[in-house]
Amino acid sequence: MLRLGITLLIGLLALPGVAVAEPPLIKPRLVVLTDIENEPDDTQSLVRLLLYANDIELRGLVATTSVHMKQGVHPESIKRVIQHYAQVLPRLRQHDRAYPDAALLLARVVTGQPGYGLQAIGDGRDSPGSELLLRELERPDPRPLWVSVWGGANTLAQALHSLKRTRPKAAVDAAVSRLRVYTISDQDDSGAWLRREFPGLFYIVSPGSYARPTWAAIHREIEGIDNQHVSNAWIVRNIQQGHGPLGAAYPDIAYGMEGDTPSFLGLIPNGLNAPEHPNWGGWGGRYELYTPRREDTDPDGFTGGVPVETETRPIWTNAVDRFRPVVPAAYGRPVKAGEREFNDALVTLWRWREAIQNDFAARLLWTTRAPAEANHAPVVRLAHATELHVRGGDWVTLDASPSSDPDGDSLSFLWLAYPEAGTLKAPLPLGTEVQARIGLRTPEVDAPATAHVIVQVTDKGTPALTRYQRVILHIEPKAP
């Protein structure tokens, strides 16, 4: 959640402080389409998602098919996980009263198209899932409607097919403009159809084979980094065993851990995520808007049998970050720059993975522990606005010292330049900065540019929890 502070210091001149009201948290609204029972990872992702039901409004949970499960849907499996959630709900509400009733969630479990792909959509083929999507699209709600697609997308395709057949074009365009879709690759042939038939549809996807998608970074073992937080041993110790009925409902891995989770990670209000700006990066990865070439999507690799079509227009898809992780230091500053630099699309997600996993583990502990016995995330606040207007060559002070921790834990700070999120070509002069308050001199520019700086604040509780604040520097050329 973006929070506003009170002052900006540039050079030696302090501008007058102006109190700014903290904006209310607006929960994203989400409908999930899941081919649950195709493999265990959908159940794994659902366990995690329910722990964030206080932060994300779950408007529908739709059981669907996919190329991996072409016939039959399993709403009963969704309901079974919600029943485990019901057992721990009283304890969760000790940590946050916003957790919804299990009965409310159960009432939002419906079935989608009973068959596979485009062959299961058309006139007269509406399903409870497609009807739910239509109702949500036409609700008088100013929030976008996010649809996370963990399997096939044909229930969404049916909803938009019916919308197009029964509403005037202006109403269709207005409804589509409110949609935000994130699909875990294309798991049936309706995804490419949706992108082609509705060119204005906001769509995040890594088309092509499963070898190259950004979402795979949630579980993939990356050479040269510490992968313990996605190991089987970590999952047993922190999730499955001794963590109550919801943790016990988390199944063992069959192929990859939680391949569907990236579709909602970017909606969690952590100060870093900016759902309307996939190119800014966040827990769900970073994506750029362009038309990918078919040959760059590994079309001959494994897709489960879904044909890889040529994209006809720009979509939000794989982007590349250049990233050098920090590593712990025994003396002096607590962290130092690592020796290895990484440069690919997977980096955009796994760079946050330790924090993602620790957050999951902490929330699962909420299901068995009283608030005084559990850890809660720090609250990151700035002593200035989140967007600063400066000129090239200015000295800028960035200050997160008003940050605090609800449990009274000690806090560690790390400031990160995120060049890929902005337009500034020159590097920011920012090293391994670990103080709450830092200064830097902005590069000189010939044209207006933006630079993103992230402050990462981590407590020293167990497990250690991290929150962020993003500062956007709007840099103008020096005055003539």
What are these regions (language model features)?
Residues G5-P16:
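Bacterial N-terminal signal peptides
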Residues A192, E476-P480:
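Low-complexity, Pro/Ser/Thr- and charge-rich linker/hinge segments at domain boundaries
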Residues L416-R441:
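Surface-exposed, flexible coil segments in extracellular/virion-facing regions
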Residues R441-P448:
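Short, surface-exposed loop/turn segments at beta-strand-coil junctions that are enriched for proline
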